[in-house]
Regions:
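Transmembrane-helix boundary and interhelical linker motifs in polytopic inner-membrane proteins
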Residues: 26-29, 60-62, 79-115, 168-175
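N-terminal membrane topogenesis motif
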Residues: 1-48, 111, 239-256
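Small-residue-rich midsections of specific transmembrane alpha-helices
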Residues: 10, 48-52, 69-98, 117, ...
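Short membrane-interface helical motifs at transmembrane helix boundaries
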Residues: 94, 123-141
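Membrane-interface junctions at transmembrane-helix termini in multi-pass inner-membrane proteins
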Residues: 156-182
Length: 260
């Protein structure tokens, strides 16, 4: 590939570094391949999600599907909130530590971030369940059980977000996006469709139990693949932990996302 002339004013600038990246054939091919994979997964995932919503609306009925959709929005928002920005900062920290071969910090961040996200999301879900019980006389009765079941999904949802970021940072495109965009809606169709096919009754609660099951299966599969693929950096001796710095940067990402 021919060299691109860079204006003198851009010497040693980010613009020049970007051009060097783009003009590297191997790196360009890798970037294009990843972009095509992500685009294809997102398109297929959007189609599966749309199909799953149509089928759920038919199987659950208008009233129960409305409850399911309402709780799903809450689960999604809480799953993002209880990630505390680690799903955004994870891409930065992991890529940086890999590039500079700081395996102790990399191992420390991988362990710390996933444990913190899981613990905080679990505490948040428990607090949410307590709030639902405290307000059960105010909340419409048909919302109580679906919200409690939906809250079970929050820690798993937050972990899925975190593991997606980890896989992206390691360049594992399929591992990052397939579980959340393809496997989860596909399992929803299989679980609820199987229940209806074999004579079961589908409602908002069973739909949310199916969501919990789909997210759990997706998270287990994703976690197993990631942990096997990153065995070397994960097993580095004496992980270095910089909790204050990681929290500060992660919360900055979270605040920025909330503002947007």
């Amino acid at each position: 590939m021919s060299t691109i002339d860079v204006p003198a004013g851009f010497a040693s600038s980010p613009f020049q570094r970007l051009l060097r990246l783009v003009t590297s054939q191997q790196k360009l091919w890798t970037v294009l391949k990843s972009a095509v994979q992500i685009f294809a997964i997102r398109i297929l995932g959007a189609g599966l999600t749309y199909a799953s919503m149509i089928l759920l609306a038919r199987w659950l009925g208008a009233h129960d599907f409305g409850i399911y959709a309402y709780v799903l929005v809450i689960v999604t928002l809480l799953g993002i909130a209880f990630s505390f920005g680690f799903n955004s900062s994870g891409v930065r920290f992991v890529a940086s530590y890999l590039a500079r071969n700081r395996l102790r910090r990399l191992s420390g961040f991988l362990r710390f971030s996933h444990k913190v996200v899981a613990a905080l999301a679990l505490l948040g879900a428990l607090a949410g369940a307590g709030l639902v019980f405290a307000l059960k006389d105010i909340i419409e009765p048909y919302y109580v059980a679906p919200m409690l079941v939906g809250l079970l999904c929050v820690p798993v949802w937050a972990l899925l977000n975190q593991m997606e970021a980890t896989a992206r940072a390691f360049g594992l495109v399929n591992v990052a996006y397939v579980p959340g965009y393809i496997l989860r809606p596909l399992l929803m169709i299989v679980f609820v469709g199987g229940l209806v096919t074999f004579g079961g009754t589908a409602d908002a609660v069973t739909g949310l139990w199916a969501l919990v099951g789909a997210c759990t299966v997706a998270a287990l599969g994703q976690g197993l693949v990631i942990w096997r693929r990153i065995r070397k950096p994960r097993s580095a001796a004496r992980p270095a932990v910089h909790a204050r710095h990681w929290f500060a940067v992660s919360l900055g990402f979270q605040i920025g996302r909330a503002h947007v």
